[in-house]
Amino acid sequence: MRHVQAEPSPSSEPEAGPSQPPVRQGALQGGLLMGYSPAGGATSPGVYQVSIFSPPAGTSEPHRALKRQAPPTEGPRELKRGPGLGAREGLPPEEPSTVGLLGPEGLGLGLGVASQHFSHRGLCVVEQRSSVTSSWTSGAWSPPCPPSNASCNTLHTRDWASPDPGGQGSLGESPGPAPPGQLHTLDTDLHSLAQIGGKSPVAGVGNGGSLWPRESPGTANGHSPEHTPPGPGPPGPCPTKRRLLPAGEAPDVSSEEEGPAPRRRRGSLGHPTAANSSDAKATPFWSHLLPGPKEPVLDPTDCGPMGRRLKGARRLKLSPLRSLRKGPGLLSPPSASPVPTPAVSRTLLGSFEESLLRGRFAPSGHIEGFTAEIGASGSYCPQHVTLPVTVTFFDVSEQNAPAPFLGIVDLNPLGRKGYSVPKVGTIQVTLFNPNQTVVKMFLVTFDFSDMPAAHMTFLRHRLFLVPVGEEGNANPTHRLLCYLLHLRFRSSRSGRLSLHGDIRLLFSRRSLELDTGLPYELQAVTEAPHNPRYSPLP
């Protein structure tokens, strides 16, 4: 590797033509370092390396010029850059830069005033401004940077250009062998290069590189790309991130800093950006007009304070209808099907007696051994039957007052027809305790001669303790329930009457009648439904 270091003086005039002396002095402030590496064979061209040194700001110390001639192995070659490429790199179209390569006479270099970048087969150019030494790299290409005090290294290489085994790898180092196919790596702290994989469309760009690489997120002036006026962009489409705002929100274009991001925003989409686009600050204003991704159609009443108020008003308007459907005082929405509620969690609807009969109290325990003997008399006397009674007791009193027992006699063992009885007559039910002693004998008189076929009804026989002398007009608050018998009747399609289902009884301990110590007597009351008295079978 041979190097030629030239230092043009600021006062010298530039010479025209590539066939002038090897070093061309012009408006460039700094020095040139040119190196030539002969090819390994006769078929592959040599490699030329040109380094441009720009002195730091405030430095005017002259440099010593060193000039070396290239070996007379290559013929004269010339490369001119067109106006289009020069305009992209900051050159006016009428002043294209020219790079001239001569043969035995030496190495000639012609540069324009604003030329900083070179691309030629077998030519490597490195620009250095604030640092004395730089590294060579292979297969990398950095984007052009605006003039600033920060260091900016730019180089163009070919991957297939093998370095000279005896050449120098960097400035200030002694010549040494370099591994084939690999050059020194550029400092990653200076540039973050975004390379696009694939073949390069231009022969002067290495494999894996791109003629127009993507710009780094931050520019040289320290501003974000959103607040920097757009410059000449790449010729092809490049995805650009935009901040999309909802259609109802208009951003402040005059503000330099963006406010907090809205709670609901659309996803950013990549759209191709033209080279001569509008100002980047105005982009958030019209970006919401761009076509966005398809989203599920939302009800206009679902978003915004006005929509929420309308929905609330609609709910208040529909609440009276729901209350009429479910009953007064209930605002719960109507359900398609009633939800079954466990018997133990039902509320106490009606009287204490009704709650006991329907099993709305949680039982405290069961007593086994009770039996019941059932008989009837009338136009005919059916046979008496004895069935077991399931007895349950409850603890529903905060004080130690006695609670009644509930007994249930299941009639299903008698068959589907139940216990047959005459339409007019008397039913006798005798309850026995586990000791086979009579607890209570119930006698109920009934008359269902007008009952149609395939209907049903019931009778409820009660026994109260009422004060003596108040049998006719006893106050209900003064009555004390002692016994209760609930019978259910059903007429078949042929008109026969029978007891069906079960028989429910409420009774108390015998001490209840003895421990009162009051002048009370028993009073029997038999009740039946009135309107309607009979109900058709389901």
Curated annotation (Swiss-Prot):
Organism: Pongo abelii
Residues where Phosphoserine is found: S254, S255
Region (Disordered) residue spans: 1-103, 153-185, 197-300, 323-342
Chain intervals for the UniProt region annotation (Required for macropage invasion): 348-430
GO CC annotation, single: nucleus
Function recorded in the entry: Transcription regulator that may syncronize transcriptional and translational programs.
Stretches with biased composition (Pro residues): 227-238
Main location: nucleus
Keywords, in A-Z order: Nucleus, Phosphoprotein
Positions with biased composition (Low complexity): 1-18, 323-334
Region Transactivation domain 1 (TAD1): start-end pairs: 436-444
Descriptive protein name: Atos homolog protein B
